[in-house]
A protein has these predicted regions:
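AAA+ P-loop NTPase catalytic core and its hallmark functional loops
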Residues: 1-120
């Protein structure tokens, strides 16, 4: 990956892809420590060959699902990429968005999902 004007890029099949920046919010988790422990336990691995579990966190809006994920990522010292899906989210929004740059050229911007897959 290259550092270019404060944004990271990578080249895939000759196309430069601008990567999303990780979330830098530092939320605080208050109460329900057991729920946080359960999410952290899902992501534990014993060896490099292990794959972590993928917990599905469901619930009504505003109950702290995103905050839980943010705090868990902070505890693990891992970068966090957030994508808020809405009713008008299109499949292409989840992948790469072509953007007309000031120079008149098209630049390609990876979604948070694609960036996290590239970064591992």
């Amino acid at each position: 990956m290259n550092q270019h004007s404060h944004s990271k890029t990578t080249v895939i099949d000759g196309i430069t892809l601008n990567l999303s920046k990780p979330d830098t919010t530092n939320p605080e988790w208050i109460g329900q420590s057991e729920v946080l422990k359960q999410v952290l336990a899902c992501w534990m691995v014993i060896s490099d060959k292990d794959l972590p579990l993928s917990p599905r966190i469901i619930g009504m809006p505003g109950i702290g699902k995103t905050t839980l994920g943010m705090v868990a990522a902070l505890e693990r010292k891992q970068p966090l990429y957030i994508y808020q899906c809405t009713s008008d989210t299109r499949p292409e929004d989840l992948i790469v968005t072509p953007v007309l740059a000031e120079s008149g050229k098209i630049s390609y911007h990876a979604s948070s999902l694609v960036t996290s897959m590239i970064n591992g």
